[in-house]
Amino acid sequence: MKSVWNSFKAAFAMFSKIPTPMVDWNKENMKYMMCFFPFVGTAIGILTWLVGYVLGSHVQMEPFFLAVILTVIPVFVTGGIHVDGLLDTSDALSSWQERTRRLEILKDSHAGAFAIITACVYFILWLGAWRQLLGDHDGICIMSIGFMMSRCLSGIGVIIFPKARTDGTVAEFSRNASEIVARNVLVMMFAALAVLM
């Protein structure tokens, strides 16, 4: 039971900026970490729904500014780890270099032109989606559930897809995960969330 609690803490420590108690980064504590990855999405979803409800219904904030706030909530909760990965991947894939060079680009901390373009498109699309959904309570709920579902799919991908490198963070998460348990839990969570939508 202790390793399950430690896996929960490890998931929040790695994938969010939400303060969590200290946890040792060892194989036992990372065993079920991917099972709890969607709970970071739960935190984002609940916060997004609450902010949308309070600022939209009670404060009656101007819709465009509310859409801006809803767009940046995931970045504040996660510290931007998901955006960082997207932008690194965009730079690497858009380089059209050989595999080894693309892997070097993934590790490079500098943002290239394609990363900046991808970031602009990413945030504009999110802003547009939120602006369109404001006033539609069901739409905001569905978007909030989507934060959990996307993390279910990401967790499944970490576990079952081939890794670009054998020594990276994702490879370590996959190697230390209880593969069958994590995959089954994530698939069941995804299915339950899909029904809930």
Please state what every model-predicted region is.
Residues 1-79, 94, 98-103, 115-197:
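Hydrophobic alpha-helical transmembrane segments
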Residues 106:
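Divalent-cation-assisted or electrostatically stabilized phosphate/pyrophosphate-binding catalytic cores
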Residues 80, 84:
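Hydrophobic "anchor" residues on beta-strands that sit immediately upstream
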Residues 110-113:
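Selective transmembrane-helix segments that form parts of the transport pathway or gating/packing helices
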